From Swiss-Prot:
Heme binds at residue 313. SUPFAM superfamilies: Indolic compounds 2,3-dioxygenase-like. Gene3D superfamilies: 1.10.287.3810, 1.20.58.480. The lineage of its organism: Eukaryota, Metazoa, Ecdysozoa, Arthropoda, Hexapoda. This is Tryptophan 2,3-dioxygenase. Its EC number is 1.13.11.11. Binds 1 heme group per subunit. Keywords: Dioxygenase, Heme, Iron, Metal-binding, Oxidoreductase, Tryptophan catabolism. InterPro entries: Trp/Indoleamine_2_3_dOase-like (IPR037217), Trp_2_3_dOase (IPR004981). Belongs to the tryptophan 2,3-dioxygenase family. One of its GO terms (biological process) is protein homotetramerization. It catalyses: L-tryptophan + O2 = N-formyl-L-kynurenine. It comes from Drosophila willistoni (Fruit fly). Pathway: Amino-acid degradation; L-tryptophan degradation via kynurenine pathway; L-kynurenine from L-tryptophan: step 1/2; Pigment biosynthesis; ommochrome biosynthesis. GO terms for molecular function: heme binding; metal ion binding; tryptophan 2,3-dioxygenase activity.
Length: 380
């Protein structure tokens, strides 16, 4: 069957043959398939003991690395748009589109794990000896993805050494890693963007003050309702629960408490950025906040899918080598990988926790006419 993009489907059609003076390259030349398809070197075959499943192992990991490259390409373009001194809001749709593309790529990567699992532990053992000292820990591109997303060095789980030491004397890899640590991450750029959310101005709509007043009124109404509870034990339980909720809200209204949580690593956003994220969540139906809300949702999707990919990888490793063996690169294998599933690797943790601070729709501060016009007309 001929390629549907190569012409009218007639293999003997002379018009499908590129003329010698035409500009451009044929399919294989354009994609450099001679290099791509010749990059599968089975060490078991070189050792005159070919193991069939080593080919699958190589292909799958090469496919991962190609998709990692595309994710980095998308992240860099998004970071460039967000890093502008004045962000062009007409670019928001393009940012959303590219983030969605990353989400779809990550879904594909998650779905690739079951293909590797068609290989049994015994099949893997047949060629595992050829892999050392190679390790997935040495995937420079995955480290770049983590850094460009916003994983902090101090948040990383340490196993035997600093994560960049595995690249040894590879100057190019080390330089790329260093640059990714210095450059503003997606987390930092999104934080700056959220800090400029319209409606946070203290001399304007002052959303944060209005939100705090709404929370106080909401909780006071709950206290009043609890006091009318005829059963003393039930009343005390409700009052205790309300007080716990008041403490939770205090953690976002008290700047000092918030900063302490950031310092401890339990929060990532600045206080102002958290305010912006909460405001966008409440007023996401307003035209100006519709795409920003989609953007925040996609960032959570990316975090979720990376966590899911890590989890699937952990389970696969446990199935293949168990939980006690060392990884081929010298790490603790399963134990190390399992430790990366914690919230310390979740970059946009604050977005996941926004639901903690929601209040009923009827309690959300109503928009006044000036801010409503501002949120309808982007040019205001």
């Amino acid at each position: 069957m001929s390629c549907p993009y190569a012409g009218n489907g007639n293999e003997h059609d002379d018009s499908a043959v590129p003329l010698s003076n035409e500009i451009g390259k044929i399919y294989g030349e354009y994609l450099m398939l001679d290099k791509v398809l010749d990059a599968q070197c089975m060490l078991s075959k070189e050792d005159k003991r070919p193991v069939h499943d080593e080919h699958l192992f190589i292909i799958t990991h090469q496919a991962y690395e190609l998709w990692f490259k595309q994710i980095i390409f998308e992240f860099d373009s998004i970071r460039d748009m967000l890093n502008a001194e004045v962000i062009d809001e007409t670019k928001t749709l393009e940012i959303v589109k590219r983030l969605n593309r990353v989400v779809l790529i990550l879904k594909l990567l998650v779905d690739q794990v079951p293909i590797l699992e068609t290989m049994t532990p015994l099949d893997f053992m047949d060629f595992r000896k050829y892999l050392a000292p190679a390790s997935g820990f040495q995937s420079m591109q995955f480290r770049l993805i983590e850094n460009k997303l916003g994983v902090l060095t101090e948040q990383r789980v340490k196993y035997n050494q600093k994560y960049s030491d595995v690249f040894g004397n590879d100057a190019q890899a080390l330089n790329a890693i260093r640059n990714s640590e210095i450059e503003p991450s997606l987390l930092e750029l999104v934080q700056r963007w959220l800090e400029r959310t319209p409606g946070l101005e203290e001399d304007g709509f002052n959303f944060w003050q209005k939100f705090q007043q709404s929370v106080d009124q909401f909780l006071d109404a709950q206290v009043q309702s609890a006091m009318e509870e005829p059963v003393e034990q039930a009343k005390n339980y409700r009052l205790m629960d309300i007080e716990k909720r008041r403490e939770v809200y205090r953690s976002i209204f008290d700047t000092a408490v918030h900063e302490a949580l950031v310092k401890r690593g339990d929060r990532r956003f600045s206080h102002r950025a958290l305010q912006g994220a909460i405001m966008i969540t409440f007023y996401r139906d307003e035209p100006r906040f519709s795409q920003p809300h989609q953007l925040l949702t996609l960032l959570m999707d990316i975090d979720s899918l990376i966590t899911k990919w890590r989890y699937n990888h952990v389970i696969m490793v446990q199935r293949m080598i168990g939980s006690q063996q060392l990884g081929t690169g010298g790490s603790s294998g399963y134990q190390y990988l399992r430790s990366t599933l914690s919230d310390r690797y979740k970059v946009f943790l604050d977005l996941f926790n926004l639901s903690t601070f929601l209040i009923p729709r009827e309690a959300i501060p109503p928009l006044d006419e000036s801010i409503r016009k501002k949120l309808i007309n982007k040019s205001v």
